Amino acid sequence: MDAGCTMGLSVTVFVMALLLSGAASLRIQAYFNKTADLPCQFTNSQSRSLSELVVFWQDQERLVLYELFLGREKPDNVDPKYIGRTSFDQESWNLQLHNVQIKDKGVYQCFVHHRGAKGLVPIYQMNSELSVLANFTQPEITLISNITRNSAINLTCSSVQGYPEPKKMFFVLKTENATTEYDGVIEKSQDNVTGLYNISISGSITFSDDIRNATIYCVLQTESTETYSQHFPIVPADPVPVEKPRLWIAAVALTLIVVCGIVLFLTLWKRKKEQQPGVCECETIKMDKAENEHVEERVKIHEPEKIPAKAAKCEHRLKTPSSDKSAAHF
């Protein structure tokens, strides 16, 4: 290798080392499923044409996101995970990464090489560090138990689909005289596909006699934000006394049973009586016979000593119907 080539290689290595050592990462943020702008911030002070430059971006694993080779895009060098997800803005020299996912966070590098008489020479490099955010849903409080005085109520609060991992979650009880924080049992989970977090907290809060009205809300803390739930109004109700069994209920029930029994007895007795008509008829016949005999005795008592023939006939007539009637009943 001649001295010229050795010297040129040394200069190239020196320039790259200088660029790498002095390169500072620019922190940028993007939201989940949105677009991130990966800057290059190259100042083309010499007004070089894109046909003289090679521009490309790579991630921290050295996978190529985009390459513009002498003014033409080269998709063959792009990693499959980035195909169709990038677009280059020639005016701002920003690379737009679309449909950002949690796994896209990390360091990205922009390289600019110039093609001269001696080949490609690196003239610019910039690092940028991408962080991905996803807003948690507004925390939502769910009441598990009823609210009464001198008893604890059970609450849960939950928020989902957020990133990065939340730091803390707690309840706040606000009354007329004080504001109190309540911790609870926190549960976190992370989706294996999206990388987003879900979080919930469960806790109990006790109300004293002097609390007439209050509000409860839930707070979710992340690295940079706090998210609040809607205020949940609390108006503890007085405990409902347990009523003892009332005596009048038992009395009414007993009365109904007795009345039903009497009605049933009378119904059965009447039905049985209707099924035996001969007994009544016999009693009626006996009563008629007794009356006839009594009449006859009265006739005999008042009978005159001498009865004319006509009177005897009349007496005979009076006796005959009675005897016939008695015979008919027998």
Swiss-Prot record:
Q: How is it modified after translation?
A: Polyubiquitinated; which is promoted by MARCH8 and results in endocytosis and lysosomal degradation.
How this chain assembles, per its entry, is: Homodimer. Interacts with MARCH8. Interacts (via cytoplasmic domain) with PHB1 and PHB2; the interactions increases after priming with CD40. Interacts with CD28.
Position of the signal peptide? 1-22
Family matches, as SMART domains: IG, IGv
Specify the protein name. T-lymphocyte activation antigen CD86
Keyword Disulfide bond tagged:
yes
**Which InterPro entries does the entry mention?**
CD86_IgV, Ig-like_dom, Ig-like_dom_sf, Ig-like_fold, Ig_sub, Ig_V-set, T-cell_Activation_Regulation
| Domain of life, per lineage | Eukaryota
Give all cystine bridges in this chain: 40-110, 157-218
- Compartments, record wording: Cell membrane
Function in brief = Receptor involved in the costimulatory signal essential for T-lymphocyte proliferation and interleukin-2 production, by binding CD28 or CTLA-4. May play a critical role in the early events of T-cell activation and costimulation of naive T-cells, such as deciding between immunity and anergy that is made by T-cells within 24 hours after activation. Also involved in the regulation of B cells function, plays a role in regulating the level of IgG(1) produced. Upon CD40 engagement, activates NF-kappa-B signaling pathway via phospholipase C and protein kinase C activation.
GO cellular component annotations of the record: external side of plasma membrane
GO process annotations (BP): adaptive immune response; B cell activation; cell surface receptor signaling pathway; cellular response to lipopolysaccharide; negative regulation of T cell proliferation; positive regulation of immunoglobulin production; positive regulation of non-canonical NF-kappaB signal transduction; positive regulation of T cell proliferation
Q: What residue ranges lie in the Cytoplasmic compartment?
A: 269-330
State the gene name recorded for this protein.
Answer: CD86
Ig-like C2-type domain spans which residues?
A: 150-225
Ig-like V-type domain span: 33-127
Pfam families registered for this protein in UniProt = V-set
Q: Which residues lie on this side of the membrane: Extracellular?
A: 23-247
Glycosylation is annotated at 33, 135, 146, 154, 177, 192, 198, 213
- Where is this protein primarily located? membrane
TM stretches of this protein: 248-268
Spell out the coiled coil positions from the record: none
Per UniProt, what is the membrane topology? Single-pass type I membrane protein
